[in-house]
A protein has these predicted regions:
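ATP-dependent carboxylate-amine ligase catalytic core
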Residues: 1-64, 76-83, 88, 121-122
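A short, structure-level motif marking secondary-structure boundaries and short turns
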Residues: 21-22, 111-113
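Intrinsically disordered, low-complexity peptide-like regions
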Residues: 57, 105-106
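Internal gly/pro-rich beta-alpha loop/helix module
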Residues: 67-68, 81-96, 100-105, 112-145
Length: 145
């Protein structure tokens, strides 16, 4: 309840602006994600494992800049929102692979790491393009260290 009270004014502000532009209110997932990030800001943690919702590029979790992005097998899901081909869906989901922000850290001296599971070849091509654009190190399936 305390976290909700902390972020409620911001949720109301976003909702009012979105509605004034003809858009929707924040979704339950977006509000819960904001609440989680508020908790992490108030009580810093070393590591957060956050699962994206439907996609990666426009997902509520995309405001975080992860040192590691893990992409599980991509299938033909959420087609109404993400696209009607494996390439379009992969393009949306590839949005979690982002360039390193700021300095590399001792825990992550090489910048962003993209761990990509076994994929349809067309999806893999899209994910690898994004990894190159983000200058991410790609850890293929089965790699260690």
């Amino acid at each position: 309840v305390e976290v909700w009270e902390d972020i409620k004014p911001f949720v109301e502000m976003v909702d009012e602006w979105s509605i004034s532009q003809g858009g929707p209110r924040m979704t339950k997932f977006e509000v819960l994600t904001a609440m989680a990030y508020s908790c992490f800001a108030d009580t810093p943690v070393d590591v957060v494992v956050a699962e994206v919702g439907m996609g990666g590029r426009w997902d509520a979790t995309s405001v975080a800049h992860a040192e590691v992005a893990v992409v599980c097998p991509i299938g033909m899901d959420h087609m109404d929102y993400l696209g009607d081909t494996i390439e379009k869906i992969a393009s949306e989901k590839a949005g979690i692979i982002k360039p390193t922000v700021g300095e590399n850290t001792p825990h992550n001296p090489h910048g962003t790491v993209a761990v990509i599971s076994h994929q349809d070849p067309a999806a893999l091509h899209v994910l690898l393009e994004q990894a190159v654009d983000a200058q991410a190190v790609v850890a293929p399936p089965g790699s260690q260290g």
